[in-house]
């Protein structure tokens, strides 16, 4: 808890058994709620999460990264979180930054905080492939122009949100795939939320989840499409539910089936 606000960490996960425990062990004591949503993994991610004392939800099918986030945010809001921090279970980002990111939200200055791999040159130092770094810089410059803000990157998966933002954004209008992250930032800009950044080191290694070249290209086209719809909606050329107040929201209309696993009687000794 920070400034009287309850902090939740949500972890969208798929086949994260090898890295999950390291991720959970680094979570700070300021975290009041720990939630993992397993997107129908083929390994023991869900069982290990339960053993570690994390509230665990399991999808009945592999719905994708974006849909996984929708479940994460619904369950965090239902649990009474005031601030929600998304941490990937693959240990690519350090959970040690959770208190700093949550504090930036708790101060009332920001509604969304992004952990940037670009600030401080953490991306290349951590092993980001050169083609991904190039795409990151090109797409970021493109979106800074058309979204009218200046961020160091739009593509990090480590981020924090206020409750108000998660309740107001029409997240159910977004993709079930990786471009969900980018769509969420564009929505936050459209709705007038304040976005801050913090420098974050990153690690690229075998067990860390990462999309391949083909999926990266698909993601890039998704970013361009999202930006085009943002501009068209803002100029009133089209009306996009993803950028309108009447769009579907996770707190009101979420529908994906996710089974919650019961926790062990004593998670420390399970």
Provide a role label for each language-model segment.
Residues 1-3, 148, 172-270:
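Hydrophobic helical membrane-anchoring modules
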Residues 8-12, 35, 58:
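Short hydrophobic beta-strand elements that form part
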Residues 12-29:
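Short, well-formed alpha-helical segments that are part of the catalytic scaffolds
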Residues 16-19, 41, 94:
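Donor nucleotide-sugar binding loop of glycosyltransferases
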Residues 38-46:
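A conserved acidic beta->alpha catalytic loop
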Residues 40, 64, 92:
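A short, conserved beta-strand element in the Rossmann-like catalytic core
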Residues 59-78, 95-178, 205-214, 221-224:
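Acceptor/aglycone-binding surface of glycosyltransferases and processive sugar-polymer synthases
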Residues 81-90:
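Short beta-strand-to-loop acidic/aromatic patch adjacent to the donor-nucleotide binding site
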């Amino acid at each position: 808890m920070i400034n009287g606000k309850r902090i939740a960490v949500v972890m969208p996960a798929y086949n994260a058994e090898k890295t999950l425990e390291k991720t959970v062990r680094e979570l700070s004591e300021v975290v009041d709620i720990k939630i993992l949503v397993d997107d129908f993994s083929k390994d023991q991610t869900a069982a290990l999460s339960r053993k570690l004392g994390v509230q665990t939800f399991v999808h009945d099918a592999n719905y994708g990264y974006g849909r996984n986030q929708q479940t994460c945010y619904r369950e965090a809001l239902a649990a009474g979180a005031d601030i929600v921090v998304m941490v990937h279970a693959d240990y690519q980002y350090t959970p040690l930054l959770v208190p700093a990111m949550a504090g930036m939200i708790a101060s009332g200055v920001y509604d969304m905080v992004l952990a940037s791999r670009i600030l401080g040159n953490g991306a290349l130092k951590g092993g980001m492939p050169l083609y991904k770094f190039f795409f990151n810089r090109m797409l970021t410059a493109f979106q800074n122009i058309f979204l009218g803000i200046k961020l160091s990157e739009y593509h990090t998966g480590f981020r924090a949100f206020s409750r108000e933002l998660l309740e107001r954004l029409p997240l159910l209008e977004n993709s079930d795939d990786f471009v969900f992250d980018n769509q969420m930032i564009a929505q936050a800009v459209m709705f007038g939320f304040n976005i801050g950044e913090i420098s974050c080191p990153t690690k690229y290694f075998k067990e860390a989840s990462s999309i391949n070249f083909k999926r990266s290209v698909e993601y890039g086209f998704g970013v361009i499409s999202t930006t085009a719809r943002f501009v068209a909606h803002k100029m009133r050329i089209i009306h996009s539910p993803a950028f309108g107040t009447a769009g579907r929201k996770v707190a009101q209309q979420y529908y994906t089936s996710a089974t919650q696993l019961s926790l062990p009687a004593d998670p420390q000794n399970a």
